[in-house]
Amino acid sequence: MAATLRELRGRIRSAGSIKKITKAQELIATSRIAKAQARVEAARPYAAEITNMLTELAGASALDHPLLVERKQPKRAGVLVVSSDRGLCGAYNANVLRRAEELFSLLRDEGKDPVLYVVGRKALGYFSFRQRTVVESWTGFSERPTYENAREIADTLVNAFMAGADDEGDDAGADGILGVDELHIVFTEFRSMLSQTAVARRAAPMEVEYVGEVETGPRTLYSFEPDPETLFDALLPRYIATRVYAALLEAAASESASRRRAMKSATDNADDLIKALTLAANRERQAQITQEISEIVGGANALAGSK
């Protein structure tokens, strides 16, 4: 009985230690969500405007540019999977990896080989464990991405995309770049504090659309200089970098929101466990005291009877 009581008290101490960790993680995630959400909101207008500008440029010229034109018989599709560097964020990574696997299956059904690029240690570990080839990976900034991080990733993706037009083989070309005919980004879209959804978006060839309140306001008119082809060559890296940066910011906000929710649930569960264990320990202690009193009374009665 004494051993059982010691075991219960040990479990209470362990649960209390875990609760301190989860509560601290919850508070840290809570403090980061507001900043991450503000960065997402600040980046959206720029991403929308550069998309609008490219849409207008495409509509104003009959340009046969790789960013706009679907390639005949595409063979490979580059897929950037954005995950987290750390765990303790619930189903965040599982959802984005599941969405990536769904995209891989869809691409293979269309006769396209996925070429994998990864952001975050969790996705890198997942694909490495399954012996899947990762062309390039970036880690260490999933919670606080910068535009420089996005531009570094975009440079790699743009080089692969532009090399796709001349790359006819199944291996890397003479320049060491494995060309791709499409670019996709799989990330977690931040919709609200309680809603984050893993999505897959095609970044190139560009799906031409006008982003904005077309029905309620006038459409912006642009005057372009120099020629459209030069503009597209200059804007392509910036467009891809903007798409990547927006995805990184959405993913960072989603990661913090998922971690806060997971840690709050873990803290609440630790509270419930501590209460249950404390109740069990009190009952065990009460039973122990009752038994000791019974033994004392029994001993006293035995002594009285012997007299």
From Swiss-Prot:
It is found in: Cell membrane. One of its GO terms (cellular component) is plasma membrane. It comes from the Bacteria. One of its GO terms (biological process) is proton motive force-driven plasma membrane ATP synthesis. Keywords: ATP synthesis, Cell membrane, CF(1), Hydrogen ion transport, Ion transport, Membrane, Transport. InterPro entries: ATP_synth_F1_ATPase_gsu, ATP_synth_F1_gsu, ATP_synth_F1_gsu_CS. It holds the Pfam family ATP-synt. The keyword Metal-binding does not apply. The keyword Membrane applies. HAMAP family: ATP_synth_gamma_bact. Produces ATP from ADP in the presence of a proton gradient across the membrane. The gamma chain is believed to be important in regulating ATPase activity and the flow of protons through the CF(0) complex. NCBIfam families: ATPsyn_F1gamma, PRK05621.1-2. This is ATP synthase gamma chain.
